[in-house]
Each structure stands twice: as C-alpha cells, then as structure tokens.
UniProtKB/Swiss-Prot annotation:
Role noted for this protein: Allows the formation of correctly charged Asn-tRNA(Asn) or Gln-tRNA(Gln) through the transamidation of misacylated Asp-tRNA(Asn) or Glu-tRNA(Gln) in organisms which lack either or both of asparaginyl-tRNA or glutaminyl-tRNA synthetases. The reaction takes place in the presence of glutamine and ATP through an activated phospho-Asp-tRNA(Asn) or phospho-Glu-tRNA(Gln).
One annotated GO biological process: glutaminyl-tRNAGln biosynthesis via transamidation
EC supergroup of this enzyme: ligase
Tagged with keyword Nucleotide-binding: yes
Quaternary structure annotation from Swiss-Prot or TrEMBL: Heterotrimer of A, B and C subunits.
Top-rank taxon, per record: Bacteria
Family according to the record: Belongs to the GatB/GatE family. GatB subfamily.
Native source species: Streptococcus pyogenes serotype M5 (strain Manfredo)
The name this protein goes by in its record: Aspartyl/glutamyl-tRNA(Asn/Gln) amidotransferase subunit B
Molecular function per GO: asparaginyl-tRNA synthase (glutamine-hydrolyzing) activity; ATP binding; glutaminyl-tRNA synthase (glutamine-hydrolyzing) activity
Coiled coil: none
Length: 479
C-alpha cells in the first residue's frame, strides 16, 4: 500500500524589537544569564504588562507579507501551564483572535511549477525562559528570553513531501527577513520549527494520526527528520501497526527520530482573555502605514531581474537570498553597473570573501559605488581581472575609492607599447638561453617569455597588449 504524506509546520519567529513585548528589558541575544530581566519578567506580585507597540507593528507587517487577513479588534489570552522557565505559570499569547489569519505564500516546486501553501494563522506571544540542566545535579533558569516577542506562523497541512516543507521554510524565511521584523537566525533561536506529519492511503480524505517533531535546528534537519518519519510510519502501517499521537525529537547523531512523550489527547491550557491588557483596535490607517514600510519581496525581485535585466533564474535566486544582498545589487545597477558583471562579482569573489570571513555584506566596507568603480577600471584597462581580486580584498577590508587605491598602490596596468617594448628587450637580454631555445625552434619556447615579462612588470602588464607586443618582438628575433 502506498501512502500520501501530510505535513504542516509551526514556525516561531523572534521579533527584533529593542525591548520585550510587555517589559522594558532588553530583548537582545547573547547576554549573561538573567542580565536582561526586571520585575515584570520575574513576575513579582502586583506588576502589570505594558504592550510594546513595535510588536503589533511587526505583526501587521508579517500578516501583510503573508497575504493574511488582519483582525481589526485584537486581544491577548492567557495560556495556562506550569514550568520553571515560566514564572507566571501562564503565557500571554493569542487564542481565538490572532493578529493574522487566512494567509498563503507561493513556493516553486522541483519541476518548475508553483504551489500555494495556506497559512492558518499568525499570532503574537511572549517567549519563555530557558532551563539548563547542569552536570552538578542542579537545574538553572535563565529568564533573558522570557518575554521576548514572538510571532508563531502556523501553516495548513498543505505540504506533501519533506522537500516541499524545506522549500516552504526557505520561502517563509526570505519573506520574513525582507520585512525586517526578524533576523531569522536559527543558530540563535530567532527562528524555530516544529513539524506535524501523518500518512494516509492515497484517495482517503481523512488525515491519519499525526506525529509532532521537535529539535529541528536547521532546515536540513527538518527535511531529514520528516524523511525518516515517512519511512518509519509507512513501515509501521504496512506491518499492521498503529500510529500513536506522540511527540518525537530528531537525533542528528543517529539520523532518526526518538520518542519524547505520548499525547493522550489535546492539552488543556484553559485559555481565557488576558485581563491586564486592553482590546487593541487596528484601523486602516495603521495597516496602510505598515504596508508603506514593506519592501518589494523576493518573488517580485526575481521576476524583475530575469525579465528586465536578463539574468538567469539561478542568478536571480542567488541575488535575492537576503534583502541586504539584493539591495546592494540594485544600488550597484542603478549607479550604472552592468547587471551581469555585478552579479558575477557578488556570487564569485564577494561570496567567497564573506564565507571565509564569516560575515554578511553589511559587515564589510565594500559599497555598491566602490564595486561599480572597480568594474569600470577593469573595463577601461586600468587594472587586469587578476589584479582586481587584490583590489577587491582591499576595498572589502578598508573601503574607499578603487581608482585612488590602484593609483596610490602602483597597481595601474601597463598598456603603453612605449613602456612595454623596452622591458621586453630587457627580458630578452636577461634570458639568453630562452632566446636561443626559441631561435632553434624548440617547441613552446615562446611561452616562457610571457612569465618573464609579467615578473618583470610585477604583474602589471596588460595581458592582451603584452601578448601582442611579445609576438611582434619575437617575430623580429626569428627574422
């Protein structure tokens, strides 16, 4: 029997506000344990939450970017549960009226077709703290993360393969990153994914019993965990077994999933409206203000790069991987840079440098006008393509004008025959054995002179001009 795979994803995204959702504590990542906390985060008696408007702004932007309807009257709810990293014994979240609902994004499948993935809801909530279990037998609670604003984006169960889930996550991450509401760095916990997967016989309308997957710390592990579950569940069903509703975690070392707990039924969190926060009215003016702050998104930019700039689908996809890279590219082209040449540099030398340095394009000194100027002085023969790589590294580390650096460092390419011919004659005089080999007709003897000339000019001879002049002067030796 063959089975159809049914996948839905829950994605938690930390919003990059300066302060937390209900307290003035810093929301920045990476501080010492409990450094970013105050009495609200610790839930001291009598303290009250104060709404951070920037969180609602971010929620509106996310809802718009994901083609969602927006609840014009929005409230928060208490989700009741006890855990050491949750000192209030409840989480402030949204239950029946999330900020966004009925959304969708479009993904591109392997065969080139597109598919619309529906998004059920996006709701705002506060993050919980973090428990660490020490080797000394004690458990430690860090509340830096407590109260950091989150938006949870819940898809419908529209994905039919692990590959579709991977593609959906990639597209979702791009869109959220373009809005500017989060850096969506999984390695820092600002994007976290839980997956729900079930199988059903082809032709059956009713969903099978789902399994929830956790500990998915990369998109690659999401795909691997889902692939393992497809095989595990199919094998169990074919052998006459029954799928239990359970939570499993992905074990990267063993490349499989491990049972965490069995779910006997839906958890009863006893939701009720948060009495310490008011109803928030989101009017059209507020929505329009947030819409005006949104950029053009990756899909639209890719179409523009292909249709208007003549780039390949691959190039367009690479250039829109991050908003910063896409903005850099568009600025360079607007300054007169050739789209294909700018694209080649960004995907070639620039990408290699960023990978080697572990940096993003915003973190280096290269600017779009620097890059355009460097491409221009390659085109006019001031420097060679080989020398340009050295110039680029200087610009990436120090910034400044490409032409000014080339002139100051003495890197200007030598193209004047009046300068090169005497150097060629000196090369002949300094390499009599090579001249003798050439005159005797020894095979490939002429090729050695190119290296001698480049060495004599410290690599500054224009390769094309140098080859032409060498051929002329060698012909004179033969004559």
């Amino acid at each position: 029997m063959n089975f159809e795979t049914i996948i839905g994803l829950e994605v938690h995204v930390e919003l990059n506000t300066n302060s937390k959702i209900f307290s003035p504590s810093s929301a920045h990542f990476g501080e010492d344990p409990n450094a970013n906390t105050n009495v609200i985060d610790w839930s001291f008696p009598g303290v009250l939450p104060v709404m951070n408007k920037g969180v609602i702004d971010a929620g509106i932007k996310a809802a718009l970017a994901l083609n969602m309807d927006i609840h014009k009257e929005m409230h928060f709810d208490r989700k009741n549960y006890f855990y050491p990293d949750n000192p209030k014994a409840y989480q402030i979240s949204q239950f029946d009226e999330p900020i966004g609902y009925n959304g969708w994004i479009e993904i591109k499948l392997e065969d080139g077709s597109t598919k619309k993935i529906r998004i059920e809801r996006a709701h705002l909530e506060e993050d919980a703290g973090k428990n660490t279990h020490g080797t000394d037998g004690y458990s430690y609670v860090d509340l830096n993360r407590q109260g950091v604003p989150l938006i949870e984006i819940v898809s419908e169960a529209d994905m039919r393969s692990p590959e579709e889930a991977y593609t959906y996550l990639t597209a979702l991450k791009e869109i959220i990153q373009y809005t500017g509401i989060s850096d969506v760095k999984m390695e820092e916990g600002s994007m976290r994914v839980d997956a729900n997967i079930s199988l059903r016989p082809y032709g059956q309308e009713q969903f099978g019993t789902k399994t929830e997957l956790k500990n998915l710390n990369s998109f690659s592990n999401v795909r691997k965990g889902l692939e393992f579950e497809v095989e595990r569940q199919a094998k169990l069903l074919r052998s006459g077994g029954v799928i239990r509703q359970e939570t499993r975690r992905y074990d990267e070392a063993n490349k499989g999933t491990i049972l965490m707990r069995v779910k006997e039924g839906a958890a009863d969190y006893r939701y009720f409206p948060e009495p310490d926060l008011p109803l928030y009215e989101i009017d059209d003016a507020w929505i329009d203000e947030m819409r005006a702050q949104l950029p053009q998104f990756p899909a639209q930019r890719r179409a523009k790069y292909e249709e208007e700039l003549g780039l390949s689908a691959y190039d367009a996809s690479q250039l829109t991987a991050t908003k910063a890279l896409s903005d850099f590219f568009e600025t360079a082209v607007s300054l007169g840079g050739d789209a294909k040449q700018v694209s080649n540099w960004l995907q070639g030398e620039v990408a290699q440098f960023l990978n080697a340095e572990g940096k993003t394009i915003e973190e280096i000194r290269l600017t779009p006008d620097n890059l355009v100027e460097m491409i221009a002085i390659i085109a006019d023969g001031t420097i060679s393509s080989k020398m340009a790589k050295k110039v680029f590294v200087h610009l990436a580390k120090n910034g400044g004008s490409a032409r000014a650096y080339v002139e100051k460092a003495g890197l200007v390419q030598i193209s004047d025959p009046a300068v090169l011919v005497p150097i060629i004659h000196q090369v002949f005089a300094d390499n009599e054995a090579a001249v003798a080999d050439f005159k005797s007709g020894k095979r490939n003897a002429d090729k050695a002179f190119t290296g001698f000339l480049m060495k004599a000019t410290k690599g500054q001879a224009n390769p094309q001009v140098a080859q032409q002049l060498l051929a002329q002067e060698l012909q004179k030796l033969r004559d």
